[in-house]
Amino acid sequence: MHLSSLLVAVLLPLALSKPTPRKKPGSFTVHLARRSEAEYARDGPTDLQRAYAKYGIPSTQGMDGYRPEPISRFQGNSKIAGGAPGAKDDGKDEKGEVENNPTSHDIQFLSPVTIGGQPFIMNFDTGSSDTWVMNTDMDDEEAKKDHHLYDPRKSKTYSKLDGLTFSIKYGDKSHASGPVITDVMDIGGATVRKQAIGLPTKVAASLANDKSSDGLVGLAMNKLNTVRPDKQKTFFENLAEDLDEPVFTAQLRKGKMGSYEFGAIDKTKYAGDLVNVPVNNKNGFWEISSALYSVGQLDKIQKVENGTGTAILDTGTTLLILDEEVVKAYYAQVKGARYDASRYAGWVYPCNASMPSLFLAVGHDHMAIIPSSLLTFQNYGPGPDGTDVCYGGLQSNNAGGIQILGDVFFKALFVVFDYRGPSVSLAPHA
């Protein structure tokens, strides 16, 4: 198999309602805040459990009883007040920008959003299609604690969509459900006047305990939208026709400020050339072919024999979750690596172990490299033998039939999501 370099060290070639925008933004950028350790305790098993629940993947032994204590965002320094956090008006209608202060860890990337003039910190999620926000009408008072709560009584632009409800179920452990409203929603200066937004009255503890996020902005395909009886458009779908291009980009970098940009592709944010990969959207996801892999070196490419051969690009998942065959092949090259179901509920290894890079197919013609520097998620500190134990950023899907390219993947690559096709394009970060 002949290989030649296309993107140095990163990509290698291989043989419903009618919401209206307030203004035509052309393009706009949202700079993201990263969770700090004071805002959210980095915990690999918890993040893996969230991903399993989201996609209905059976939990492994030891996961069900794993419940670490959440750490409130308000123990840190990122409490927001007043108007849109960090919002700037540059006097130009075609572009809005939001500034955020970076925090000390990049477990997950979050964005300021205003709904009905009220400020929130929310997660952009390319793995779902509902927008919902914590609110004053939730049944559980405990669930409200340490969140910014949307109050419909404080909004002059609130309107209830009579008869419409939403219900997101992430497996059987995580859910949010309730009525649906419309309100003015602003992200980075781009505004939709009547964005459909779920106001959950019931929220699972696993969502309520995520104190660093007040809700979610879904950016997957409309097919996944759970509003019934009439599906609703995502924020991006409502804006797409008014953008210069129907695209958005994700720049999620390790230890650095990240951003999403809607309507334009900033060539200064990536190196080399973009590689375009077709998306299969029949299930509503940004799903691409990914049936080949190699550990350490590109000259030992293997075909995944027992998996689906596809992967979902999901900014709402922190880890890289691949077919068990790939994960076992990778950790076979890491001295001391083991699957620990009882204590860590995942793959761990000595932190001083030498880690190889991982090559993954993106589409049928290219492979992406995930550098070894991105594949350690968490240091748990000394184990019984005094050696620090690390939790892998790469974990198994337990033969769950779904591979998930989460933030570990995005830290390696700049990604363009293009509704034309649809497709994604990838390149190394600049």
Swiss-Prot record:
Propeptide residues, chain positions: 18-87
Keywords for the protein's UniProt record, in alphabetical order: Aspartyl protease, Glycoprotein, Hydrolase, Protease, Secreted, Signal, Zymogen
Signal peptide range: 1-17
Listed Basic and acidic residues bias regions: 87-98
GO MF term set: aspartic-type endopeptidase activity
Domain of life per record: Eukaryota
Glycosylation (residues): N306, N352
Domain Peptidase A1 intervals: 109-427
Assigned EC number: 3.4.23.-
SUPFAM superfamilies, A to Z: Acid proteases
Entry-linked CDD domains: Aspergillopepsin_like
GO cellular component, one term: extracellular region
Protein localization: Secreted
Matches recorded under InterPro entries: Aspartic_peptidase_A1, Aspartic_peptidase_AS, Aspergillopepsin-like_cat_dom, PEPTIDASE_A1, Peptidase_aspartic_dom_sf
Classification via Gene3D superfamilies: Acid Proteases (2.40.70.10)
Primary residence: secreted
Region (Disordered): 59-105
Pfam families: Asp
Enzyme class: hydrolase
GO biological process entries: proteolysis
Family: Belongs to the peptidase A1 family.
PANTHER family attached to this UniProt entry: ASPARTIC ENDOPEPTIDASE, PUTATIVE (AFU_ORTHOLOGUE AFUA_2G15950)-RELATED, BETA-SITE APP-CLEAVING ENZYME, ISOFORM A-RELATED
The protein, known as: Putative aspergillopepsin A-like aspartic endopeptidase MCYG_07979
